Amino acid sequence: MSLFPALRPIDNDLYVEVILQEDVPVVETSGHRPPEDLLELLKAAGVKTMHKCVSVRHALSAQEAGVDAVTLFGSEGGGHIGEYGLSTMILAPRAADALEVPILAAGGIADGRGLLAALALGADGVTIGTRLLVTEECPIHQNLKEALAAATELDTLPILGSLHNTLRAWKNPAALKVAELESSQADMREILALVAGTETKRMYQHGEVDAGVIACSQSIGIISETKPVYAVIDGMVREAAMIRDRLAA
């Protein structure tokens, strides 16, 4: 379960109530610092907590707040990448040197090469997102899966920087229009209309790939086919082990 900041008001207390009722084992929060009142409720119930952030400074705050692990999210990643422009290659070793809790590296990781690189940089594990979009189990429309599988590493762009909420998204007509509106200092309401969840729903539910905005990592350039989730995870582990053995030979 994930608790993320959003552009619209969200009652996280209701989410926590359901989390506790359903015995969710792990919860990830995101942002500058995890909400300590929610952390207390979760930890008292035995729920493991993780916090996703885009800087070591925020990771240290999360550690101080009492989370069990921290995810460092590099600017290659798909989604809200912050305003620092720091890559996973920099964040992972910095966090490994600075933190005592386990760290996960995220952003731009989609195969065994990325997994092994993250471990070499000091991470205890990785988080993957975009790779799981292009899987058999992912419930997005087949049109969108095929479009993402055909994309390259050049087919993403950061948007919403004008709202101080930078998001790396797939470069479709809707995302390009958002970038155009931002550069012309258009009314914020025009921008928000394009990134509304109702527009994104047209994309992932009905296959209208030109509508809406969807988070997408630069790792899309190394994703070329739809696979079962098991095959993705197993393939990553096997590839990482094979490269490790080759380097050790």
Language-model-detected regions and their locations in the chain:
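Acidic, glycine-rich active-site loops and adjacent beta-strand->loop/helix elements
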Residues: 7, 76, 108-109, 131
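Conserved active-site-proximal phosphate/metal-binding subdomains
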Residues: 81-104, 110-249
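Active-site entrance/lid segments in N-terminal catalytic domains of soluble metabolic enzymes
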Residues: 1-98
